[in-house]
Amino acid sequence: MHQRILILDYGSQVTQLIARRVREAGVYSEIHPGDVDDAFIREQAAQGLKGVILSGSHASAYEEGSMRVPAAVFELGLPVLGICYGMQAMALQLGGKVSFSDHREFGYAEIVAQGGTKLLSGLADFQNDAGQDVLKVWMSHGDKVTELPPGFSLMASTPSCPIAAMADESRGYYAVQFHPEVTHTVQGKALFSRFVREICGCEGDWNMPDYISEAVARIREQVGNDEVILGLSGGVDSSVAAALIHRAIGDQLTCVFVDHGLLRLNEGLQVMQTFSENMGVKIIHVDATEQFMGKLAGVADPEAKRKIIGREFVEVFQTEAGKLQGAKWLAQGTIYPDVIESAGAKTGKAAAIKSHHNVGGLPETLNLQLLEPLRELFKDEVRELGVALGLPPQMVYRHPFPGPGLGVRILGEVKHEYAELLRRADAIFIEELRNTKDPASDLSWYDLTSQAFAVFLPVKSVGVMGDGRTYEYVVALRAVQTFDFMTADWAPLPHPLLAKVSSRIINEVRGINRVVYDVSSKPPATIEWE
């Protein structure tokens, strides 16, 4: 059993980043709601728990009815790290005082370290004129600790937040008002590594080779000799799930690959070559293009299109699953963020939560047990696992693609003609992004963007080609850069790259005579157009 760190979530939108930072230090971590009972905490302690981290929150710690830290957290003798709200809750429960700050801090701040604590000693971005260590951090708080609890000492301060960090090293309690989990805090990774490795004493036994061995053993034990069916979309999550399950049980796995006619150029062929021909996975390839296109005819509303595509996929999958009489398990590519978001939606703890199609996705009428081998992993870990399992890096590290496919990248009604034009234009855009390197970083512009794609606009514009007038369609190019997809900036692609993409699309894709580039950030725009 792995050593583990328990993260108690009080509603912060970046709690998942805490878990990722801990895992980057080679230590397994799990997120659970902040109001779990004492029995749960003690149960965790009996399963290799080495420390606890208390997350931030959008709520105020001193308001009546605010969430409190389970008492057992402070009774087990384990190291505890409080972050923002977690610091304030710790202070209140251990005898300190918290008040609303006259000067709310949001954004970059510079904190001055006080004394040599285990957590912050030597973690400096620079030294000030007085020779004190200074860290560049990210603040986001309205409340602040105004009086230290008994036994605590000051660890760091800012002019507007005199108690920016505190510690009771005799008990292993540490708390910071800033957010070390976000990339803006320069020493954030080092801080988490020091807490989990040096203070909690974790050895760093969380790694991908061991995970593969353990996951294969779990799948074999769970499934036995039963048959498993999996809906293979060609996306990263379902592809990695298929590769992992196939390694565990071989021909007991059957994948159903539904081609709805809205995939990227040659995507169906690539999926079949990778899994069926190269890996020997049993795949049922269903070309349901006409069925989907027929149902989408005349439908322009984006949400209606999504629902139709989702409904038809379930119908096709159910039909194929019904033909496999021996199947007893339904495998899905559910990953850890899906599980966290689903739990948050049920408890209502998070401020902004989306539902996910994988969690409880397909109807219970299939009467199949659920197999989710990736449910402990974050996306970056899923990609690492995919490479370790032998999947092509281009498949594993490809940009996100919406479940409804090109159906939501064709504005308005979906038609065969529109899908074919968009497929070819999009392929040219992606090809040129892969082939063009940024001299400063030596990375391709595909790697420097988080998501890039073409959008089909169902309007025509006047153009001139040769000596003749044209009246043809328009495509928009969209490329964004983001850390978390909650906010995003449009990517500053080089003008020569955009010029080449535009020229190729207009010359090679008959039916398109104008290319535009989307320079909208999120917010106010969303990444996808529909």
UniProtKB/Swiss-Prot annotation:
ATP binds at S233, G234, G235, V236, D237, S238, S239. The keyword Transferase does not apply. PANTHER family: GMP SYNTHASE [GLUTAMINE-HYDROLYZING], GMP SYNTHASE-RELATED. PROSITE patterns: GATASE_TYPE_1, GMPS_ATP_PPASE. It catalyses: XMP + L-glutamine + ATP + H2O = GMP + L-glutamate + AMP + diphosphate + 2 H(+). Its EC number is 6.3.5.2. InterPro entries: Class_I_gatase-like, GATASE, GMP_synth_C, GMP_synth_GATase, GMP_synthase, GMPS_ATP_PPase_dom, NAD/GMP_synthase, Rossmann-like_a/b/a_fold. The lineage of its organism: Bacteria, Pseudomonadati, Pseudomonadota, Betaproteobacteria, Burkholderiales. Pfam families: GATase, GMP_synt_C, NAD_synthase. Keywords: ATP-binding, Glutamine amidotransferase, GMP biosynthesis, Ligase, Nucleotide-binding, Purine biosynthesis. Pathway: Purine metabolism; GMP biosynthesis; GMP from XMP (L-Gln route): step 1/1. This is GMP synthase [glutamine-hydrolyzing]. Catalyzes the synthesis of GMP from XMP. It comes from Bordetella avium (strain 197N). GO terms for molecular function: ATP binding; GMP synthase activity.
